[in-house]
Amino acid sequence: MAAQVEIYTWSTCPFCIRAKSLLNNKGVEFTEYVIDGDEDARDKMAQRANGRRSVPQVFINDQHIGGCDDIHALEAAGKLDPMLA
């Protein structure tokens, strides 16, 4: 069974685009929550992300992974694929 991946984004955020590109290039299906200007959605994201309000915020199997730099660091360390399996 493939991992459940969720990502909170803003539509024009370059870091969000970069994180989604990594997931797309790996063929990963994910649920995207575009929260442009929606403070209620951003508050919900922050609750799940240990108070972090920056985007993107990535979750794999309901575990908070972090932002763009975090997901790319996991990829560089060879740790992302096992999480996505």
Predicted regions span which residues?
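Local sequence-structure signature of Cys/Sec-based thiol-disulfide redox active-site neighborhoods
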Residues: 1-31
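Conserved short-loop catalytic and cofactor-binding motifs
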Residues: 11, 33, 46, 68
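A short linear boundary/processing microfeature
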Residues: 29, 51, 74-77
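Thioredoxin-like thiol-disulfide oxidoreductase module
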Residues: 35-53, 82-83
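Structural micro-motif
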Residues: 50-59, 69
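Non-catalytic, surface beta->alpha helical segment in thiol-disulfide oxidoreductase systems
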Residues: 60-85
